[in-house]
Amino acid sequence: DIDLLFVEAAVNDHGNYFCAIDQVRGMEGIVRHALLANPSTDIVMLHFIHTLFLEMYPKGRVPDVILNHERVANYYLIPSVHLAHEVSDRIAAGEFDWEQFGGIHPAEPGHKIYAASLAHLLDKMWSRVSVSDAVEAHSVPEPPLDVNSYYNASFADISQVKLSKGWEQ
């Protein structure tokens, strides 16, 4: 069973031009599927940085993809970490630049920044619990945020695939 799941899709959902509906459906699919499989799984949503986000945060704007994923986080009462905002602020403050960070797929310095932020989060969260505390199941809200989200997705053997018109093996 999974005890702790970190989920991040802001960079790819934005970079692959998924619409707002699909951003919510995809993120809810991951979160809901995980909680239905094991209601005791703790989930933390992460928001990594994309080049275009660097222009938004200094203007006080939050990228739509992050707002869409936050709808899911709020609905399922899971915490999120806005690493994109932190990185943008630190670049604006001159602590490092985009090249030093390593870009969308961070170099070692960028990974260290993400790791330090997550270590801080875990230290904070662990300070609130004791090893003797019982693991509690999370409630899964009904109905889903989007009834067409992808939480019922599954893998299928290729032999089960039926090709629609215009496709061939």
Predicted regions and their residues:
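Conserved catalytic region of serine esterases and O-acyltransferases that act on ester linkages
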Residues: K112-Q169
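Alpha-helical cap/lid subdomain in secreted, periplasmic
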Residues: I2-A134
